[in-house]
Swiss-Prot record:
GO biological process terms, semicolon-separated: protein modification process
Any single Pfam family the record assigns to this protein: Flavodoxin_NdrI
Function: Probably involved in ribonucleotide reductase function.
Listed GO MF terms: FMN binding
Similarity comment text for this entry: Belongs to the NrdI family.
PANTHER family registered for this protein in UniProt: PROTEIN NRDI
Name under which the protein is recorded: Protein NrdI
HAMAP family with a match to the protein in the record: NrdI (MF_00128)
Amino acid sequence: MSALVYFSSSSENTHRFMQRLGLPATRIPLNERERIQVDEPYILVVPSYGGGGMAGAVPRQVIRFLNDEHNRARIRGVIASGNRNFGDAWGCAGDVIAQKCGVPWLYRFELMGTQRDIDNVRKGVNEFWQQLPRSA
C-alpha cells in the first residue's frame, strides 16, 4: 500500500480521524513555513474550509503543498472532510482538488468521521491501491 498525506487544522478533527484509521500517513505542517515533499504516490486527506463556499475551501497549507510540482505529480486521489452544515459545499475541497489535479474524489466524511467512515476508508484505500497500475 502506498501513502496517505493529510492536513489537519488546530481543531485536530482530521488528525483524530487519521489516528483512528491507523494507516501510515504524513501530515502537512500547520506552520506554512515548514515544507514537506512526498516521494511516492499518495492519497490526500483534506478538510474543507470557508463556511460553505468554494472560495477558500482548500486550506492554504494544502495549496502550497500541491503547488510544489514534485508533490502534485504524485497525488493519486483525494478524500475530503467537512461539515454537513455547509450544505452542497460539504467536503468541497475534495471537488476542487480532484478537478485541479485530475484525480478521483474517493470519499468524504463529516468532522472526525464515524466508525463506518473509518471502515469504508480503510477498505476503499486498500482496494484503490490494488486496482491502480503499478506505474501510476
